[in-house]
Amino acid sequence: MRNLGLLEITLLCSLFVYFRIDSVSSLNSDGLALLSLLKHFDKVPLEVASTWKENTSETTPCNNNWFGVICDLSGNVVETLNLSASGLSGQLGSEIGELKSLVTLDLSLNSFSGLLPSTLGNCTSLEYLDLSNNDFSGEVPDIFGSLQNLTFLYLDRNNLSGLIPASVGGLIELVDLRMSYNNLSGTIPELLGNCSKLEYLALNNNKLNGSLPASLYLLENLGELFVSNNSLGGRLHFGSSNCKKLVSLDLSFNDFQGGVPPEIGNCSSLHSLVMVKCNLTGTIPSSMGMLRKVSVIDLSDNRLSGNIPQELGNCSSLETLKLNDNQLQGEIPPALSKLKKLQSLELFFNKLSGEIPIGIWKIQSLTQMLVYNNTLTGELPVEVTQLKHLKKLTLFNNGFYGDIPMSLGLNRSLEEVDLLGNRFTGEIPPHLCHGQKLRLFILGSNQLHGKIPASIRQCKTLERVRLEDNKLSGVLPEFPESLSLSYVNLGSNSFEGSIPRSLGSCKNLLTIDLSQNKLTGLIPPELGNLQSLGLLNLSHNYLEGPLPSQLSGCARLLYFDVGSNSLNGSIPSSFRSWKSLSTLVLSDNNFLGAIPQFLAELDRLSDLRIARNAFGGKIPSSVGLLKSLRYGLDLSANVFTGEIPTTLGALINLERLNISNNKLTGPLSVLQSLKSLNQVDVSYNQFTGPIPVNLLSNSSKFSGNPDLCIQASYSVSAIIRKEFKSCKGQVKLSTWKIALIAAGSSLSVLALLFALFLVLCRCKRGTKTEDANILAEEGLSLLLNKVLAATDNLDDKYIIGRGAHGVVYRASLGSGEEYAVKKLIFAEHIRANQNMKREIETIGLVRHRNLIRLERFWMRKEDGLMLYQYMPNGSLHDVLHRGNQGEAVLDWSARFNIALGISHGLAYLHHDCHPPIIHRDIKPENILMDSDMEPHIGDFGLARILDDSTVSTATVTGTTGYIAPENAYKTVRSKESDVYSYGVVLLELVTGKRALDRSFPEDINIVSWVRSVLSSYEDEDDTAGPIVDPKLVDELLDTKLREQAIQVTDLALRCTDKRPENRPSMRDVVKDLTDLESFVRSTSGSVH
């Protein structure tokens, strides 16, 4: 009985196992394949996890409503797998190939990664394959030979690389192919022309090269073609074949040759023609007038020239016409007035002239008129006031004149009015903000008069108000309480009355400039409510009373200037909250009392000017704690007493010091440690003792201090020694010492005469030596002999550089003495050399921490030798563009400091040298880097000096890529030319690219490349994003550093403005960078 029981139990277990296994295996192959796929998914949404399950009663996934699964009519095989936008991640397993009846596969908008499985080729019934918007990588598998039914193929927006498989050309049923936004390379397959049913082709935003295949032009059904943002070249042939169905064509950001195809007019169905920055040349073909259906024409940022063809007026469906950033000239054709559907006319940055045809101002559909930076003239007609949809009227930097129509704004649609830099006269129209939409109110730099309309107080949408440099008068209106207003500049007018208190209610104001007016009364304490304010300039007015302590609420203030008013009292102690302040100007007022001790807490202060007040007492030692002081310290014309505090010697970065016209006493010895000083004025005090030798070569002023003297041991020019008496109290020599000196001198004279006799004898015999070639007035030099010995008489093996002005050698004299020797080759006219000698002696007196210091100069018959300290890190060009593999990447902070240092040096040449020195050839090769990566400008002054003296002088001075447009064919240079070159260097620092980079299309430089990229970039506030050096991407994830890069880019674009008068001075550049340096430390915002 017992054995029988065991047998029954065994049979029952066997049956259970049998039926269990049978139930598992009952799920068909498609179901098992799906479950296998599930194992490769990292993240599975609930809809999938809860429905993709084994069920003992079902044999197919079709009967249990598996999420995303659709089967055929029989309910046995899977035909559709649609998991689009399901939040899936992981990989696509090879089991996908087991779904052999699959017709539709849509896994788009997920986070799949890894390779595309080659087993997809087994899904031979596939008609629709969408794997777009994932993170697939690797090459596209060559599987399309077996997918003959494929009609829609979407692989766009992944990280796929490699070539486009030629087998795609065998997909004869293909209608829609999208592979854009990947990293595909190589050429577009010629076989793609076999896809005769193809209607939509998107290959944009890859790395494709070569020409568009000829077969592509034969696709008669092609309606939309997108190949922008590649490296395609060759000539374009659209219109030469049947393109009647082509609706959209975008070829932007490639490097094609030639111009717009003259036959393009044959593509009569075109709705959108976009060819931005394609390197197009030549003229705009008149055949484009045949495009009656086209609504968008964008040929911006090319090199198109000639006139705008009048035939464009036949494009009766045109809504957007963008021809900006080309070289178009002549007048705007009146035929454009026929474009009754035109909404946006963008012709800025060309060479257009004449008046805008009156008919264009009558196109009622116009929303944007952007024609700035041309040479257009004429008056603004009253018809502009009748454009009910006009949003943007941007005409700045032209030659428009006359009155602005008084009814402008009654059309209620205006959002931006920018007429800056024209010759408009008359009054400001009173209804500009009638529609309560106006954001930009910019009428600066015109000849407007009258008052600001009172209606401005109701305009709550304003963001920027610029009315500076006009002839406006009257009382400033009250401003509405606003959270959008960020910028107000009403400077350089004749406004009277008090500062509106209502400005204090505009909580997001970043900049207020009311300088150079006739404002009176007190500074309103309500301005202290502006917690984001970065710049407040109230200088050159008639303001009075004390500084309100409430201004301490402006905790982010960078720049505070109330100079040239009638303010009085002392500096409120509450201003210690200005921790970010970089510039403080209180000059030319009636302030009194001592310099407050709390100023030492403003450790980012780089410029302090409190001249011509009634400050008194001793200069506090705490001033020496202002380690960031660099641009200037001006305490002149006050009543300070006592000695200069020794702590002042800690201000090692200070470049300008003015303590003149006080009652200071004692020695100047503390100033000898200030190595960066390039301008000093200590005149009209009561200083005593020797003048520090480091100050004697600067633009220093010492008059009015009768007890100052020069040490007899100082090696200074005869002119300087003549101006000052020698210091007294030197040890009197005894009679026997005098006798010895006299005897020694006599022997020296005899030896010198003998040596001169030998030299003359050698010359008569025709013996040539290096020293014999030195001009007599220069004398012989022991140091020169050392230099020649160290370089084997300037042997080529010691060459470390060649430039436009000569060859540079490295001379190692031992004991750590390293020099760079520049050899200049002269022409044979000695008179020019004598002039050069005087000029170079002048250069030798120039001292600045960011300029290469000329140590010695020797003039010889055929050349001159200039001796400089050797710079171990080479040039900025070497550091930025030729970094060794092992070298660290030049990070953004270092690049910013380099930009700031160069600006300081160039500003000194332009504004602190008399006469000013124009460099003429600013470029990275002429900027040398010391061991601390501090930049030093070299070759300053040489371009002008050598113009008439060197063998190699060219007609046009400067280097291609750095020459300002106005100097392309001229030898005359100006400060503005240097500013342009500096702007190019800034762009190199931001982008990491050369001025003429190999990656640019032919004849494109870095300035035009940056402008073109930014013109098509969607985020107008992020000017650094699309151009920044890829090596900086990680570092610039820091919001503050990124903002700094954006502002530097904007500054570079201003420096490289086509019009010299629009460029900032180098002093302005220094100010902007210094303020930005401080501002970025404290906030991620920016001053606009």
Curated annotation (Swiss-Prot):
One of its GO terms (cellular component) is plasma membrane. The chain crosses the membrane at residues 740-760. One of its GO terms (biological process) is response to wounding. GO terms for molecular function: ATP binding; peptide binding; protein serine kinase activity; protein serine/threonine kinase activity. It catalyses: L-seryl-[protein] + ATP = O-phospho-L-seryl-[protein] + ADP + H(+); L-threonyl-[protein] + ATP = O-phospho-L-threonyl-[protein] + ADP + H(+). It is a single-pass type I membrane protein. It is found in: Cell membrane. Residues 761-1088 are cytoplasmic. Keywords: ATP-binding, Cell membrane, Glycoprotein, Kinase, Leucine-rich repeat, Membrane, Nucleotide-binding, Phosphoprotein, Plant defense, Receptor, Repeat, Serine/threonine-protein kinase, Signal, Transferase, Transmembrane, Transmembrane helix. Pfam families: LRR_1, LRR_8, LRRNT_2, Pkinase. Residues 1-26 form the signal peptide. The modification Phosphotyrosine is found at residues 868, 908, 962, 969. InterPro entries: Kinase-like_dom_sf (IPR011009), Leu-rich_rpt (IPR001611), Leu-rich_rpt_typical-subtyp (IPR003591), LRR_dom_sf (IPR032675), LRR_N_plant-typ (IPR013210), Plant_RL_S/T_kinase (IPR051716), Prot_kinase_dom (IPR000719), Protein_kinase_ATP_BS (IPR017441). The active site is at 921 (proton acceptor). Glycans are attached at residues 55, 82, 122, 149, 159, 183, 194, 209, 229, 266, 279, 314, 373, 411, 537, 568, 658, 698. Residues 27-739 are extracellular. ATP binds at residues 800-808, 822. Interacts with BAK1. Interacts with CLE14. Acts as a receptor for PEP defense peptides. Unlike typical immune receptors, senses an endogenous elicitor that potentiates PAMP-inducible plant responses. Belongs to the protein kinase superfamily. Ser/Thr protein kinase family. This is Leucine-rich repeat receptor-like protein kinase PEPR2. It comes from Arabidopsis thaliana. The lineage of its organism: Eukaryota, Viridiplantae, Streptophyta, Embryophyta, Tracheophyta. The gene is PEPR2.
